[in-house]
């Protein structure tokens, strides 16, 4: 019984080797020859166009791999196994029945055109871009600011007007003003006794 199983396995291996000698692989002899003859790109997972294969053995479309390499110029690694990869470390793959024998690495996909949206027109004087943006800058030494003239005449002051008396915002501002005055008086008193 063991000899029958051994002879059966040897006959099946000889028939598969005969099929391989005729140019058929095991996948093609099953009737799916057209489906197994295409290769999939490891980036877009679609049928590869202008196929290239890396030295580590992974297959890619050249446009996909080119975009991968262009977006990572400082760290060029294989998308699958992270081995070193570059334009010179890939091999073009030509299949049976392909019409073009041109190296796909020679044709790089065109770079997309940049689009610049037009800036919004706010109108009026921008004050070098600082007036409307809520940015205010003043400088001085101690209690003597150099912007006294600009502060006194309210030139290019982007702050809102003070709150009207009697509103909740006005009472909150008055409370904070008194609180900070009290803290300042405490600090001055502490400096005097220290």
Curated annotation (Swiss-Prot):
Transmembrane segments: 133-153, 174-194
Xref: SUPFAM superfamilies: RING/U-box
Region described as Required for ubiquitin ligase activity and protection against ER stress-induced cell death: 31-82
Any one biological process term the GO annotation gives: innate immune response
UniProt keyword list: Autophagy, Endoplasmic reticulum, Immunity, Innate immunity, Membrane, Metal-binding, Mitochondrion, Mitochondrion outer membrane, Transferase, Transmembrane, Transmembrane helix, Ubl conjugation pathway, Zinc, Zinc-finger
A Gene Ontology cellular-component term: mitochondrial outer membrane
GO molecular function terms noted in the UniProt entry: ubiquitin protein ligase activity; ubiquitin-like protein conjugating enzyme binding; zinc ion binding
Low complexity composition bias: residue spans: 1-27
Primary subcellular site in the record, as a coarse category: mitochondrion
Involved pathway(s): Protein modification; protein ubiquitination
PROSITE patterns the record matches: ZF_RING_1, ZF_RING_2
Reactions accelerated catalytically: S-ubiquitinyl-[E2 ubiquitin-conjugating enzyme]-L-cysteine + [acceptor protein]-L-lysine = [E2 ubiquitin-conjugating enzyme]-L-cysteine + N(6)-ubiquitinyl-[acceptor protein]-L-lysine
Location in the cell: Mitochondrion outer membrane; Endoplasmic reticulum membrane
Span list, region Disordered: 1-32, 92-126
Membrane topology (UniProt): Multi-pass membrane protein
EC number: 2.3.2.27
Annotated zinc fingers (RING-type), start-end: 41-82
Domain comment in the entry: The RING-type zinc finger domain is responsible for E3 ubiquitin ligase activity.
PANTHER family: E3 UBIQUITIN-PROTEIN LIGASE RNF5-RELATED (PTHR12313)
Function: E3 ubiquitin-protein ligase that regulates selective mitochondrial autophagy by mediating 'Lys-63'-linked polyubiquitination. Acts in the endoplasmic reticulum (ER)-associated degradation (ERAD) pathway, which targets misfolded proteins that accumulate in the endoplasmic reticulum (ER) for ubiquitination and subsequent proteasome-mediated degradation. Protects cells from ER stress-induced apoptosis. Responsible for the cotranslational ubiquitination and degradation of CFTR in the ERAD pathway.
Name assigned to this protein: E3 ubiquitin-protein ligase RNF185
Source organism of the structure: Danio rerio (Zebrafish)
């Amino acid at each position: 019984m063991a000899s029958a199983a051994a002879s059966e396995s040897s006959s099946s291996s000889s028939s598969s080797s005969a099929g391989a000698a005729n140019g058929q692989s095991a996948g093609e002899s099953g009737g799916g020859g057209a489906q197994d003859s295409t290769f999939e790109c490891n980036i877009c997972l679609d049928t590869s166009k202008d196929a290239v294969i890396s030295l580590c053995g992974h297959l890619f479309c050249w446009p996909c791999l080119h975009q991968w390499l262009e977006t990572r110029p400082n760290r060029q690694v294989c998308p699958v196994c992270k081995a070193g990869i570059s334009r010179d470390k890939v091999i073009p793959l030509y299949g049976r029945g392909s019409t073009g024998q041109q190296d796909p690495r020679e044709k790089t996909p065109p770079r997309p055109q940049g689009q610049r949206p037009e800036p919004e027109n706010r109108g009026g004087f921008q004050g070098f871009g600082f007036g409307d943006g809520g940015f205010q800058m003043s400088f001085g030494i101690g209690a003597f600011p150099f912007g006294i003239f600009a502060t006194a005449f309210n030139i290019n002051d982007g702050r809102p007007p003070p709150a009207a008396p009697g509103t909740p915002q006005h009472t909150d501002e008055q409370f904070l003003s008194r609180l900070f005055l009290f803290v300042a008086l405490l600090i001055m008193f502490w400096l005097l006794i220290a």
